[in-house]
């Protein structure tokens, strides 16, 4: 397996997210990135998310540029270190990355990174959001599972678990916010559509 493919896949998703953020900024005059830096739960979740993303990027770059050194330092998880699982991992990374990008674009002007102080966009409940309340996060978790299979080492597992915990916490904070903003409409949506899938 090419050690650069996982890095390339994650960079494509990252660049797509950056392009969308720039586009939304140009269209609305405001950044869709609303992560806070406060000392409250939301600020902590934002810092944790940024730390996990930075660690994942550094890890995948190290794997791509110095595969022998990373393998020597971390070893590989033997049960996951097979060509078939590597291929499945790359497929999951591609699927998850694609789902993440499509879900971000599908939200149009409602897409934000973080919880906005003022909700000025409609609740999105159609398209991918008719099947999952959180298809962006479903895509991210799918890509992370793929990363563990494509790059089967302890750091990949630790980052995937950390991200899952962080995402699960973020979802619950967003649900509280959306329930306050959209009230009964959001409650009805929650009864109709599951949190994950």
Swiss-Prot record:
List the GO molecular function terms.
methyltransferase activity
InterPro entries in UniProt? Phopholipid_MeTrfase (IPR007318)
Q: What is its EC number?
A: 2.1.1.-
Cell location: Cell membrane
Keywords (alphabetical) are: Cell membrane, Membrane, Methyltransferase, Transferase, Transmembrane, Transmembrane helix
Q: Pfam families in the record, alphabetically?
A: PEMT
- Bilayer-crossing residues are 3-23, 51-71, 82-102, 141-161
Q: Which domain of life is it from?
A: Bacteria
Tell whether Cell membrane is among the UniProt keywords.
yes
Q: Does the keyword Transferase apply?
A: yes
Membrane topology summary:
Multi-pass membrane protein
Q: Which Gene3D superfamilies match?
A: 1.20.120.1630
What PANTHER family does this protein's entry cite? Answer: PROTEIN-S ISOPRENYLCYSTEINE O-METHYLTRANSFERASE, SLR1182 PROTEIN
Name of the molecule in the record = PEMT/PEM2 methyltransferase family protein
Q: Which organism is it from?
A: Sinorhizobium sp
């Amino acid at each position: 397996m090419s050690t650069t493919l996982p890095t390339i896949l994650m960079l494509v998703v990252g660049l797509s997210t950056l392009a969308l953020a720039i586009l939304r900024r140009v269209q609305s005059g405001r950044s869709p990135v609303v992560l806070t830096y406060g000392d409250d739960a939301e600020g902590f979740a934002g810092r944790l998310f940024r730390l996990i993303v930075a660690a994942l990027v550094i890890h995948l770059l190290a794997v791509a540029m110095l595969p022998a050194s990373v393998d020597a330092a971390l070893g590989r998880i033997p049960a996951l270190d097979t060509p078939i699982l590597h291929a499945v991992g790359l497929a999951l990374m591609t699927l998850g990355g694609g789902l993440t990008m499509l879900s971000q674009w599908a939200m149009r002007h409602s897409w934000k990174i973080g919880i906005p102080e003022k909700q000025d966009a409609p609740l999105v409940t159609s398209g991918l959001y008719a099947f999952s309340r959180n298809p962006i996060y479903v895509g991210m978790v799918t890509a992370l599972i793929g990363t563990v299979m494509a790059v089967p080492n302890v750091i990949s597992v630790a980052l995937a678990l950390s991200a899952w915990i962080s995402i699960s916490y973020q979802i619950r904070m967003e649900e509280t916010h959306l329930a306050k903003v959209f009230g009964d409409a959001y409650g009805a949506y929650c009864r109709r559509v599951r949190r994950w899938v």
